[in-house]
Structure formats: C-alpha cells, structure tokens
Amino acid sequence: MKSLTHYLWFTTKQRQEIIDITAEVAAQVAKSGVREGLVLVSAMHISASVFVNDHESGLWQDILTWLEGTVAPWDPGRYRHNETGEDNAAAHLRSLTVGHEVIVPITDGKLDFGPWQRVFYGEWDGQRKKRVIIKVLGE
C-alpha cells in the first residue's frame, strides 16, 4: 500500500474564514501515485473544521450567518469555557458542529466527488498559525 502525508499551514487574515483547499488536496493525491484509495483531510486544531460542500460565496455567507445566529454566537459571556480566561468557546462549538475531518474516495487517481463538491478549511478562531493534515492511502 502507498501512503503520503502532507501538511497545509494557514494564518488567516480574519478570525473566521472559509478556504477552498480542493486543489491542494488533489495535488497531493496526484503526487502520491495512489490510483484507488482514500484521502483523509483533517484540521489539527480544535477550533477549525474541514468539510465538503459547494464553492459558492452566498452559501459561505449562509454558513457563517447560521453559525453565528443559531449554533454558536460569538458572545464571550455565554460560555463556561470562557470563564477559564479563554474567549473562543464559540469556535470550539463551531468545529464540533461543522466537523473536524473528511475522507474522500480516490478513483483512477483523482478525487471522486459528486457534482459541485469541494473540500474546505473552516477557520473559526484564526489570525494565528494552524495546520491541516492530508493523508493519502491506497494502491
């Protein structure tokens, strides 16, 4: 079995951002030489997410609005975690809700997506250095 491990590093300009990382994931799949297998893409921080969805700016804004309005409003006084001196409980809850990692099938050496699917990094507490692991496995 072949395998490849690669890390993507991010320092976002904003506290919250959604970044399309599909091209980087596809490049690592190609570099690995795996024709049939899986690629795991995982945020290595507990205040970030990796997810699959559509690359459409209106949807991105809808996601951010949903997280702020329904899931985990950025209200430091609302969370017990913030009583410890932290201010990012909302980011932890957003990561928990959106998801921490994805596994994408590889078929004929390429990411095997449905229509419109892309891989995204969701930063919920940014402006500092963070990373994502890409782990390609297969034959």
Feature map (PLM): residue ranges:
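Active-site histidine-anchored catalytic micro-motif
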Residues: 1-139
